[in-house]
């Protein structure tokens, strides 16, 4: 499989909108900003910890991942490694992150036929947003924050609920001339959701063996109970298959919790797997 470098430059392709939060009876804190060339939006029930402390923890995670693993920063450890023969200076944190990326891609490869293996340091950015979501989620649990919503550039982790109200999110209509929510839904359990698409940045994902993505393929969202990075990898791998029938068959045959939006008969259509529907029940 041959893919251009832009395969990895996953900007915000597909919005997952936050539509609702915990009950208004409980104060929900919102922290937002920019990171990794995109936005982040984090909401959580007010905890025993000072909000500034939590905000600092989040920023430290972003700084650490950027300084360690960004393939776009010339002074990052990964960039230094690529330009240097002195592997002794390659810190353990980079090795650990690389090993995690390889594990994620190997797992996705077993699910999606033809999925590219992230087996080189240039692939760090492939699941960086999903990985950062998972790290922040883990940190929140360490801080005993149980109800939260984390969204980094469309890669999302949702946990908890309050007073019988679930977190609500919506998927944006993938057609650029049709603004609005395509499909809203409630999240009734702890879930990660990631989406891949080409409509905001045409051609940035190249199909297997360098082929072009069918213009009828609009977007794919994947859910996973544990890992946002894994959902991120699966969504990208499925989208890169490039053909409507091939994507549908992979989702169906492998039991992937996915929502596939595509053009058919001159109108937008969607395919929801049985596993996707079950996770939303």
Model-derived regions: residue spans:
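Mature catalytic core of soluble alpha/beta enzymes
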Residues: 2-14, 21-281
């Amino acid at each position: 499989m041959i893919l251009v470098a832009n395969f990895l430059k996953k900007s915000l392709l597909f919005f997952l909108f936050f539509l609702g939060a915990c009950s208004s009876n409980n104060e929900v804190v919102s922290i937002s900003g920019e990171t990794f060339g995109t936005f982040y939006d984090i909401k959580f029930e007010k905890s025993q910890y000072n909000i500034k402390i939590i905000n600092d923890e989040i920023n430290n995670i972003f700084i650490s991942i950027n300084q360690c693993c960004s393939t776009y920063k010339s002074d990052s450890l990964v960039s230094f490694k690529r330009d240097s023969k002195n592997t002794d200076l390659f810190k353990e944190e980079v090795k650990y992150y690389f090993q995690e990326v390889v594990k994620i891609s190997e797992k996705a490869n077993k699910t999606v036929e033809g999925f590219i293996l992230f087996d080189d340091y240039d692939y760090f950015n492939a699941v960086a947003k999903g990985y950062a979501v998972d790290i922040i989620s883990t940190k929140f649990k360490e801080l005993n924050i149980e109800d939260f919503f984390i969204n980094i550039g469309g890669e999302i982790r949702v946990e908890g609920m309050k007073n019988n109200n679930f977190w609500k999110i919506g998927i944006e209509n993938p057609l650029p001339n049709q603004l609005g929510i395509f499909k809203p839904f409630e999240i009734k359990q702890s879930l990660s959701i990631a989406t891949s698409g080409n409509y905001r940045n045409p051609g940035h994902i190249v199909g297997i063996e360098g082929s072009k993505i069918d213009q009828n393929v609009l977007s794919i969202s994947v859910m996973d109970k544990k890992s946002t990075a894994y959902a991120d990898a699966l969504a990208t791998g499925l989208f890169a298959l490039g053909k409507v029938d091939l994507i549908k068959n992979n989702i169906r045959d492998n039991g992937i919790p996915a929502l596939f939006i595509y053009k058919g008969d001159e109108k937008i259509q969607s395919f929801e797997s049985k596993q996707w529907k079950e996770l939303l029940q």
